[in-house]
Amino acid sequence: MYWKVRKTSPEQIARQYGVHAALGISLLLNLILATTRPAMPKVSAELKVSFEQFAKQVTEHLLDTSYISYSDSTVALLRDELAPAVVKQLQDSEMLAKSDDDLRATAKTLTEERQVCAVKIKSIDPSELTPNGMLPVEVKGLVAIHSAQESGPTGPVNFDFKFLIGGKVGADGKPAYAADGKTPLPVVANFQDASTKPQ
């Protein structure tokens, strides 16, 4: 019997086994990338609690229209709690006083109307840290406003705020820490009002 000897060229081998080789190389590279990628930063439990409390405090200050505490809350937001870009964003949307005169005028109006407000936080939901070490936190709840002249909403209004909280940087460009020297001082680096507007 006569057997035909087959000549195989590198081209034929590549055509026949090329897909398998490419798949094997791709699988190997993906395995290497998966095992050597940098780990996503994890947030400690203490820091998460600290940032949650900070988000609650900022929310209360943003919604504070009580004549007793409005000025102090607004000054705290402007000086300590918000990054300059967020201050500008909130001033442009008229959620914050644009100047000291504006702050005094609003405080005077609130005092004349004897306006008070109550904020009820329903949920504070932190997410995972972003790659640059910031913690997204969503705060939902209700705010009720009452004044002697009954101006403003007649019932509680829902709110939904989304904050991106990071560590504050001092004037020297280094991270600022609390008195314990370990806990970074938080600051709101980004803000989004996702509240549904009342009809």
Cite the ranges covered by each PLM segment.
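Structured, amphipathic secondary-structure segments that form assembly/contact surfaces
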Residues: 2-20, 37-45, 49, 64, ...
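Hydrophobic membrane-insertion alpha-helices, especially the h-region
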Residues: 18-35
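Active-site-proximal helix/loop capping residues that flank conserved catalytic or ligand/cofactor
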Residues: 26-28, 56, 75-76
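N-terminal alpha-helical signal peptides/signal-anchor transmembrane segments
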Residues: 55-66
